[in-house]
From Swiss-Prot:
Binding residue positions for D-glyceraldehyde 3-phosphate: 165
Gene from which the chain derives: pdxS
Alphabetical list of InterPro entries matching this protein: Aldolase_TIM, PdxS/SNZ, PdxS/SNZ_N, RibuloseP-bd_barrel
Protein name: Pyridoxal 5'-phosphate synthase subunit PdxS
PANTHER family named among the record's database cross-references: PYRIDOXAL 5'-PHOSPHATE SYNTHASE SUBUNIT SNZ1-RELATED
Catalytic activity: aldehydo-D-ribose 5-phosphate + D-glyceraldehyde 3-phosphate + L-glutamine = pyridoxal 5'-phosphate + L-glutamate + phosphate + 3 H2O + H(+)
Biological process according to GO: amino acid metabolic process; pyridoxal phosphate biosynthetic process; pyridoxine biosynthetic process
Pfam assignment, any one: SOR_SNZ
């Protein structure tokens, strides 16, 4: 019962930022711009994904002092990233009071086999996923929120679209099997393909969606990108390099918030898309060497 209550509390926090935008920020000034623009939360980190991609090296948890400065400067929730499998980084982030930990493929993985046991923490976690199997495995580990991995730091939404479609197609298969009474196929799918408990599959079949909040992330650079992901069924969006690598961050931040909230209103999206200045310079995915792709980290 205690574990269930903890899961409910963690998922409850994730629902609080539903329909909102979480923005990457690297300092107090950016955090205040994000809050003024209407961000639901900020992600505090020392380097945005675009810089991590260019500069290379080992990307680790940010300096706790920087995270605390941002926490002191804003009234909205503050998230921070830990490396995949690095449970001590997560312990540190929990100890300084971050509102949510992102076990992130954007940072250099600390463990190439295991993710963090998120059920051992009171802080909620968000994790990336490219398909239904990855999403459900992270939820089984205790994740309270899922996001598409996309391909962070590219300004190119194509991978986020691919990952959201894969999750949706997986859910449709589960629902279809359930409606046709194909229980044996569901059991086989859970055991051999998705590698998750049958209870999670049953929950997906009943809800016809993931049992936790599911955000878009990775390559979102424009208001239209945000609205696209929302129309595909996302519950909100993370925007990393797309805001503060653009020509007019404050205006673009507000526009993305408006487009996320009004995702089904093309006239509003068109209006907020006017005169935003230059978007971040994007990268075509096929120009990225295989070993530099971030989304492949952590399955």
């Amino acid at each position: 019962m205690k574990k269930l209550g903890t899961d409910l509390l963690k998922r409850g926090f994730a629902k609080m930022v539903k329909h909102g935008v979480v923005m990457d920020v690297t300092n107090v000034e950016q955090a205040q711009i994000a809050e003024d623009a209407g961000a639901a939360a900020v992600m505090a980190l020392e380097r945005v994904p675009a810089d991590i991609r260019v500069q290379g090296g080992v990307a680790r948890m940010s300096d706790p002092e920087m995270i605390l400065e941002i926490k002191d400067a804003v009234s909205i929730p503050v998230m921070a990233k830990a490396r995949i499998g690095h449970f001590v980084e997560a312990q540190v982030l929990e100890s300084i009071g971050v509102d949510m930990v992102d076990e992130s493929e954007v940072l250099t993985p600390a463990d190439e086999v295991n993710h963090i046991d998120k059920r051992a923490f009171t802080a909620p976690f968000v994790c990336g996923a490219r398909n239904l199997g990855e999403a459900l495995r992270r939820i089984d580990e205790g994740a309270a929120m899922i996001r598409t991995k996309g391909e962070a730091g590219t300004g190119n939404v194509v991978e986020a679209v691919k990952h959201m479609r894969a999750v949706n197609e997986g859910i449709a298969r589960v629902v279809g099997y359930k409606e046709m009474g194909l229980e044996a196929e569901l059991i086989q799918m859970a055991r051999n393909e998705l590698k998750v408990p049958m209870e999670l599959i049953s929950e997906v079949a009943e809800l016809k969606r993931l049992p936790v909040v599911n955000f878009a992330a990775g390559g979102i650079a424009t208001p239209a990108d945000a609205a696209l992901m929302m129309q595909m069924g996302c519950d909100g969006v993370f925007v990393g390099s797309g805001i503060f690598k653009s020509g007019n961050p404050a205006t673009r931040a507000k526009a993305i918030v408006e487009a996320t909230y009004n995702f089904d209103k093309p006239d509003v999206i068109g209006e907020v898309s006017k005169n935003l200045g230059e978007a971040m310079v994007g990268i075509n995915i096929d120009e990225i060497p295989e070993e530099k792709l971030l989304a492949k980290r952590g399955i």
